Amino acid sequence: MKQYTATANDDGVRLSRFVQSVTRDFPTSLLYKSFRNKRVKVNGKKAAPEYRLQAGDLIELYINDEFFPPEGAKPAPKAAPKRQPKQPKVTVIYEDENIAVLYKPTHLLCHSDRTGDANLVDAFTQYLAEKGEYDPHGENRFKPGICNRLDRGTEGLVIAAKSYAALRDMNEIIRNDLLKKEYYTITVGVPQSGRFTAWWEHVEKNNKVSIHAHQSQDERRKQIITDVDVLRTAGPFALCKIGLVTGRTHQIRAHLAYLGRPVLGDIKYGNRKMNERTGTKTQALCAVRISFLEISEESTLHYLSGKVIKLKDPQIVKQFDALDKNKAEPDKGASHAEN
């Protein structure tokens, strides 16, 4: 029999998931058989697989030792990339006991991928480990994670969670649309200010999205709504504030391209000639503001209600200031503002 005491990072974790995290090569069929046969108990009583743990719960597992790692053994590591990159120092914009809001620079991945390049999750984990807030070797049930991702070529604010409860509740906030994000972008051509609607469709073949004026007959497309506010203009360019009413993959980049005013530097959806003429090699898009609406009092993150977090002096404004107004003229494009 093995005993465990639920920690703060286990708070809210489904019991079946906890059991899977502390066992090794334990078949799912045996997992649920153990629950039926009362071989999994919490605080001395039979517990269901869907039970949500609370910090301090005593978990007793009457499971054969062969399904547990040897005493003192570290959790089996995930397959490591061929090279171990040096993780960058994280820039913290806001931090409390549950979350941190980080600045992600252009070209830094949010999550690890097969390239093995540095990424924000590992950099944040290293940051917490150095502060003594996380033990990567002693904790095998939770790893700090980020709650909203940005494309590799996009810079700006990213929310990171320090605990499972914070990650769970922040994801719930995002699902319930209680988190609003604003971006700055530089467009090729000056768009109209206003609210724009269209229909979004993902094209798996080339990992792009296509934007359309109407829903498809098979109703596979999803409606997108994007707010555009032109802040400044400089010849053929505009510095715009973008608000996302909906949040789809590549929504800002693809929607602005559909409107004929693509993001400067965007390789996938942008104006290649203008990118080359200006020497812009990455998309001019930055997440600059996060604001929270009213959050349920039951949430561990209720205290964030009404809070606004901003990126001060974003680099994209300096990039706009430096643009040469006379380098090129934009391609003509139609605008589809909603009246």
Language-model regions, residue ranges each:
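RNA pseudouridine synthases
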Residues: 1-339
